[in-house]
Design a protein with these regions (language model features):
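Catalytic-domain carbohydrate-binding cleft regions of carbohydrate-active enzymes
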Residues: 1-157
Length: 158
C-alpha cells in the first residue's frame, strides 16, 4: 500500500517566477480525509499500521545502510536455494519476516501465494501455514495479503 501524506498542494501563488525550473505536476488533495469517509477509515488504519511497523522498518533501514541489503526484496534474495522463488514477480519480502502478496487487479479479491520454507502466519486470519507450497488467499478492499514468519514478534503489530 502506498502511504503518502506529503507532496504539492494547490498553489496559492504562481511559483514559476520564484522557481522557474520547478514543474509542479500535482496539486490535488492528498490527505487521507480527502477521499470520503469509507476510504478515510481504510487509510487511517494503514497509517496506524505503518506507525506500529516503524521499529521494524528502522531496523531494516539501518541494516540496508550497513550492508546494502534492501528492505523490499525479491523472494529469491532470502530464499536463493528455492527455484520457485526465482519465478515470482508479484510477491516480495519486506525485511526477513514479512511476505507481501499484493492484489493488483481491480475487483480481484484473491490470489495464489507461494510460501517459502518455514512456517508462516496469515496476518488477517492468524492461521499458520507450512511453507514450500502454494496457498489460496482472499482479502477484502480494506485488507492486504501478507504473512509473517512464525516466531517473529512483528506479528503483534498486525
Amino acid at each position: 500500500p502506498v502511504m503518502r501524506l506529503h507532496g504539492s498542494r494547490l498553489r496559492t501563488k504562481n511559483q514559476k517566477d520564484r522557481h522557474p525550473d520547478v514543474k509542479e505536476r500535482s496539486g490535488g488533495d492528498n490527505e487521507i480525509w480527502s477521499f470520503g469517509e469509507e476510504n478515510y477509515k481504510i487509510l487511517k488504519g494503514l497509517v496506524e499500521l505503518r506507525e506500529r511497523l516503524r521499529p521494524y522498518i528502522c531496523h531494516y533501514m539501518d541494516l540496508a545502510s550497513e550492508t546494502g541489503a534492501p528492505i523490499m526484496r525479491p523472494m529469491f534474495f532470502d530464499y536463493y536455494e528455492d527455484e520457485v522463488c526465482y519465478t515470482l514477480e508479484d510477491q516480495y519480502m519486506f525485511g526477513e519476516d514479512i511476505l507481501f502478496a499484493p492484489i493488483s487487479a481491480q475487483g480481484q479479491t484473491g490470489r495464489e501465494v507461494y510460501l517459502p520454507e518455514g512456517s508462516w502466519i496469515d496476518v488477517n486470519t492468524k492461521e499458520v501455514y507450512e511453507g514450500k507450497k502454494w496457498v489460496t488467499c482472499t482479502a477484502q478492499l480494506h485488507q492486504f495479503i501478507a504473512f509473517v514468519r512464525e516466531g517473529s514478534n512483528v506479528i503483534n503489530v498486525f
